[in-house]
Amino acid sequence: MKILVTGFDPFGGEAINPALEAIKKLPATIHGAEIKCIEVPTVFQKSADVLQQHIESFQPDAVLCIGQAGGRTGLTPERVAINQDDARIPDNEGNQPIDTPIRVDGKAAYFSTLPIKAMVAAIHQAGLPASVSNTAGTFVCNHLMYQALYLVDKYCPNAKAGFMHIPFMMEQVVDKPNTAAMNLDDITRGIEAAIFAIVDFKDRSDLKRVGGATH
């Protein structure tokens, strides 16, 4: 099994991005699966262009995109990506699309095809906080998740794809009182646990367990 893992460069005034730092620490093989990690720019269309190049060349069985969600307390596999860019801040090249479809020929939304509840369970087993998230936002993270599912559907129809948000690193919150953060090694362990579940559930349906929210 081959798994493509992506991590964004820093954005929004941050000097580092835990997504990129964490995937740099991943081993080349996890649970027998070959792991390929790539950096993607925090730029709307350009991130998808980079992803497409690697999907076409690597032909992965699964794509896991990782992104920073400052303020979240745990690792959060995303359930759904919507076909809408609505940028609160500009991306790293100054683009700020407002109420713009990501793909005019795409679906209104794509659900993750990764075993998100099994991923949460595996992260819990590693002793780390995790939960299913029902919104990936409307910035580049949602954009890339949507594009990943669109591109996999087009170029690797038998592959799975999805996204997981991670918290700030400890170094990012020294001047942000009362802001949640996690040690980089723990973030990396959480991603490894999630990948273990992706491999383990390659030919199985996801766990059927409570993971919803009331609001």
Curated annotation (Swiss-Prot):
Record InterPro entries: Peptidase_C15 (IPR000816), Peptidase_C15-like (IPR016125), Peptidase_C15-like_sf (IPR036440), PGP-I_bact-type (IPR029762), PGPEP1_Cys_AS (IPR033694), PGPEP1_Glu_AS (IPR033693)
The keyword Protease appears for this protein: yes
UniProt GO cellular component terms: cytosol
GO BP terms: proteolysis
Enzyme Commission number, as recorded: 3.4.19.3
Keyword Lipid metabolism appears in the UniProt entry: no
Organism superkingdom: Bacteria
Reactions the enzyme catalyzes: Release of an N-terminal pyroglutamyl group from a polypeptide, the second amino acid generally not being Pro
Major site of localization recorded for this protein: cytoplasm
Molecular function in Gene Ontology: pyroglutamyl-peptidase activity
Entry-linked Pfam families: Peptidase_C15 (PF01470)
This protein's UniProt keywords: Cytoplasm, Hydrolase, Protease, Thiol protease
Enzyme class: hydrolase
Purpose of the protein: Removes 5-oxoproline from various penultimate amino acid residues except L-proline.
Subunit and interaction comment: Homotetramer.
NCBIfam families documented for this protein: PRK13197.1, pyro_pdase
Matches recorded under PANTHER family: PROTEASE FAMILY C15 PYROGLUTAMYL-PEPTIDASE I-RELATED (PTHR23402), PYROGLUTAMYL-PEPTIDASE I (PTHR23402:SF1)
UniProt protein name: Pyrrolidone-carboxylate peptidase
Gene assigned in the entry: pcp
